[in-house]
Amino acid sequence: MDSSNYFHDCKTMLSEHNESIESSNNDINGKQKEHIKKGNSENQDVDPDTNPDAVPDDDDDDDDNSNDESEYESSQMDSEKNKGSIKNSKNVVIYADGVYDMLHLGHMKQLEQAKKLFENTTLIVGVTSDNETKLFKGQVVQTLEERTETLKHIRWVDEIISPCPWVVTPEFLEKYKIDYVAHDDIPYANNQKKKKKKKSKGKSFSFDEENEDIYAWLKRAGKFKATQRTEGVSTTDLIVRILKNYEDYIERSLQRGIHPNELNIGVTKAQSIKMKKNLIRWGEKVTDELTKVTLTDKPLGTDFDQGVENLQVKFKELFKIWKNASNKLITDFTRKLEATSYLTSIQNIIDYEIENDDYASSNFDDETSS
């Protein structure tokens, strides 16, 4: 057998072997033995008329070639379909900007919505600077670095621009190849008083920062995608919750050893808050005691008298606490002003004047009597 027939024979046997995978194990073993037999007879002459394992005729070879060509054409068609699907699922760049101070559930849901606007999305998140946020919106709790670092740990975020411009411009969209800007649909006005006009490649767009939405031009240009806000969840709401219990947080911080200066309050304010909270707690205890006395099922008598005595003890304890706190407050105040020596000198002068008045009065009485 020449080499060309041998390789063709091997190709045929491999094809038969692949087709026999779905058949029984006996057929597979038979094909393997046949492959080994033909491999050992490489240098022997093969009679196509007598040997059933001989090389197929030219007609069978043409059929195999036609099958190979049809399979190739089919794979080419599948490849073209895949290319078409890739084009249809083109990557879309979405941009979402904000302050993202004290990152909360509302922020995370907004970023998730932006990420899922399209099947294949790259989400770029812009974080506003500390200075512009204070100028246009108000004081922030976290610094730019803290807000940026927090966003890095959100799964929906692909890229971060920090700091980002307060107002999105056409140049900004072109620079970062942004397709759409995602934000809630509520008009977002800029707090500046004057009207600015920005130019872009011979064209201009303007917005009244006091009355008009800064995203208005994006909406008109079809570059805006609205996201839904999470009701009842915002940074402002969180701060309001804290302020409602401001004195509770102050007292707890003082109990943990934090100095009043670190809380931006004076010593006098700190003592006042402590006294107020103590009085509130005492009042709650008195109310509970009165409730227990008045709601008792027992007849008034010894138990009632005992309850009154308990109230008297509580009042005495309150007076003692109040007196000690007042003395401490006055002492701290006088020490703070360093007025103790001044008050002592005034007292000495008063005592001296009284002594002189007594001496003069006694002399006057002696003279009149004589």
Curated annotation (Swiss-Prot):
Catalytic activity: phosphocholine + CTP + H(+) = CDP-choline + diphosphate
Binding site for CTP: 99-107, 137, 183-184, 188, 229-233
Entries under Pfam families matching the protein: CTP_transf_like
Classification via SUPFAM superfamilies: Nucleotidylyl transferase
Biased composition annotated in UniProt, kind: Basic and acidic residues: 30-40
Record field: compositional bias (Acidic residues): 44-72
Binding site for substrate: K137, W166
InterPro entries per UniProt: CCT (IPR041723), Cyt_trans-like (IPR004821), Pcy1-like (IPR045049), Rossmann-like_a/b/a_fold (IPR014729)
Biological pathway: Phospholipid metabolism; phosphatidylcholine biosynthesis; phosphatidylcholine from phosphocholine: step 1/2
Region feature (Disordered): 17-85
CDD domains cross-referenced by the UniProt entry: CCT
Molecular-function GO terms, alphabetical: choline-phosphate cytidylyltransferase activity; phosphatidylcholine binding
Enzyme Commission number(s) of this protein: 2.7.7.15
Keyword terms, alphabetized: Lipid biosynthesis, Lipid metabolism, Nucleotidyltransferase, Phospholipid biosynthesis, Phospholipid metabolism, Transferase
Top-level taxon of the source organism: Eukaryota
Record family assignment: Belongs to the cytidylyltransferase family.
Function per UniProt: Controls phosphatidylcholine synthesis.
Family matches, as NCBIfam families: cyt_tran_rel
Name of the featured protein: Choline-phosphate cytidylyltransferase
